[in-house]
Amino acid sequence: MKTNMRKADVKKQIVALALAAVFALPGAALAADTKFPLTPNSGSMEFDHLKRQYEIPNFRIGGKYNLDADPETWRNGGEGGTTLESLGAAPLKVAYIAVGTPRRNDRGEIINAVIVNTFYSGDSTNMYNFWYDGQPGNGFSGGAVVGPGKAIDTNRYYVVFLDALGLWGTSKPSDGLGRKFPSYSYFDMVQTNYRLLRDHLKIAQVEVATGVSMGATQSWVWGVMYSPSGFVKAIMPIGGTTASDGDDPIGAWTFLLAQSAIESDPKWRATNGNYYHLPVDQHPKQGLQFMWSRLQLTGFTFPVRSATPWDRIEREVFYWEPKGNQSAAWIARVKNEDPVDFWYRNDSGFNYNINKDLKRIKARTLVVHVDTDMWLIVDNARKSAKAVDGAVFASFSDPTAHYAVFKAPNVLKDTIKSFVDNTFTTSLPGIAGASSGGGGAQAAVEKPAGLAK
């Protein structure tokens, strides 16, 4: 009986965590007019007062980056890109939250920065809530990650939480351009934030570039673009990918279906996504609800989904004509989200593939992944790690699948802290006995030859 009670308690905890993931991510009410921007400045508005913005005039979005050229040639974006000013809009803006203790060289430049790139639907306020010490979202991550004495120690590092081009505090389609907004790439996300770090915050080098999910993907790109010059000293992608085109069939399939869900909305089809002239209550929000429902089906392991009571599940199941609590989770969520913003976010991944460029990475590299991730398969992450000289690969299993990326720094606490602090030894801490509390995760670390670099 005692064992059964424990199993039941664990099951309840897992179901509760799965539901928490849905509601922990951005969601707030939007006024019924069509004033721009259509979406808020922050994913977690309670932390909006901490966010700062920076303008980058005449930045070319959507251009081609020649990685063999001097990085100064991409200072204002890739060749052939489009500036927002040329479309009659304000200059490009980026946003961030900074905490910690800056240490400066004799030129007054910061030399101890750690950057935290944001995930697919989030921003700096979300990552601050989940990871910074003492915030209400810490429980979602199994505890704080950033703060005094934490894995990323703010007594030792200057930590910058970054927004990513296309959502929340950065320039985005829902600022008013809609489908006229230039298509952007992960290279654009990184380059705009490089300009923020270098020009505005006067950061001379980044000790570690990290992030979860799409934030991890950006960390990979930081390594490709800015480790050869020494600007980025180490990268720590947690649950990211180095390709989301045909080199990753499951990932590409998943997000192509997500894109198709947006486009399936009759209001989208009637306007071809050009609907900003309509009242907000006539925008194609159901397609966005459909997208989230599709993604969430495999956002957690099937045992988690199977253990969730139907009266809770149907809040996450998409219905074209919902009744009662059907689709309630997504109806609430998309009130402050715009379908065009997410259409562009999805589009940015379909042509993304840096596998052939991984050899450019000269940074210390720790690749962290969740073995049970059903969106971004662990075998692909392992292959990417093997392509980088001296990279270390660490993984663990968790029933919350992809969403376990947020708790990874606490599951692999010793390994990650020693990597961040550059105190790795041959014993590689955290190999045995690591667990995620109720999740029963088992951690493993692999050390290829040539770690010391």
PLM features per residue range, with description:
Residues 205-209, 213-249:
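Conserved hydrolase catalytic core segment
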Residues 142, 146, 150-200, 248-279:
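Cap/lid segment of the alpha/beta-hydrolase catalytic domain
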Residues 97-174:
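N-terminal cap/lid subdomain of alpha/beta-hydrolase-fold enzymes
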Residues 32-113, 428-453:
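Catalytic-loop region of hydrolases
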Residues 374-380:
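Conserved alpha/beta-hydrolase "acid-adjacent" motif
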Residues 399-410:
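Catalytic histidine-centered segment of alpha/beta-hydrolase-like enzymes
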Residues 231-332:
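Alpha/beta-hydrolase-fold enzymes
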Residues 361, 367-369:
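Short beta-strand/loop motif that positions the catalytic acidic residue
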